[in-house]
Each structure stands twice: as structure tokens, then as C-alpha cells.
Amino acid sequence: MYQKENCVEKSMTGAVIYDECNIHGRVETNSTHALFYDDIETNNSRCNNFRNLTNLIKLSLMNVLMTSLESLFFIKNIMKLMMVICLEWKTALLKLLLFQWIVQKIVKQLLKNSTFVQNLKMYIILQTLHKRNPIDLHVQIHCATIVRMKTFKTILILKQQSVLQSMVHLILNFYQQFTIQSLMAQITVWKSQ
């Protein structure tokens, strides 16, 4: 582990970075995109660190918000990521099922936001003009995540930062307030709607 004062190490291909949650990764860039490799460690103490989970959700939300909102694809991958990090959570499957419902509801609400919808349309137009494929979030078996980011996508993300931040807080607050019994009850209610 690098010391705090050496938190950024420049190299030929990019930089090794560390954030305040001690999640470290590698950033590599070329003329068309940047790759961020989030090296997820199998450390039990990290599984209870919701700041780490926050960063994971942020990365994943950035991916889904700036694409064509293929929420099922997004949910499938974020669930895989969370399972990799916290396999020992006894309530992991139930919490992940709850998380799926939350994301679906938030995405529906987000589509009612005219500013976001306008930016989304702009992104899709730019994507078409530049003949870029949708940015993908790939879940790797060896516990690494790759997020591909285009320049114009990054600009739109900055415009939506406040929306993104509020979504992260909403998900985390909702995610933490349930016991296994209340989870079962809430999921049953949602399924009946």
C-alpha cells in the first residue's frame, strides 16, 4: 500500500490513484476514452464500509445515467459487483433484491426530470454523430470493474452531479434502514403493486 503522500503515481500508461476510502485503481487514457480499473480487495472490513459502497454506486450510476437507461443491464451488473464485495453478508441477496426495486423506482422518477431528459437526448445525439457505442460497465470475474468514459459524457455527468449525489444518498439511506424481516415484508408489498 502506498503512503498517503504518494497517493498518485504517474506512469507511462496513466496513474495509480487512491481516494479517501482507500479504494485504489488504475487510470489509463488514450485519444478516445479512459479506463478506470477499481481493484476490489477481498477484505472483510471493507465490506462494512458504506463509503466504499457509495463510490461503487456512483461509478455504476454514472454509467447508467449517461446511456440509454438500460436499467436491467445495470441492475444485473451492480448486483454482481456487490456480491463480489460482500459475499459474507447473510442478507446480501435480500438487500440486492431491494436495491433492484430502488433503482427501478429512481430511474422512473429521473425520467420526469426535464433537464436530465434533455441532456440524455443530447448525449444520444452526440453518441450517434461520433459513431460511439454505448459506454459499458463490465463486471470481471477477477474482481475488477472497468468504466469507459468519453469526453462529452464526462461533461454531461458534471451537469448532473447534484442529481447523481442525491440519488446516491437516497439509495444508501433506503438500503441501510431495513432488517431482514422488514425487507421480506417490503418486497412482498412491492411485488403486489
UniProtKB/Swiss-Prot annotation:
It comes from the Eukaryota. Keywords: Plasmid. Repression of replication initiation (possible). The expression of the D5 protein is developmentally regulated. This is Protein D5.
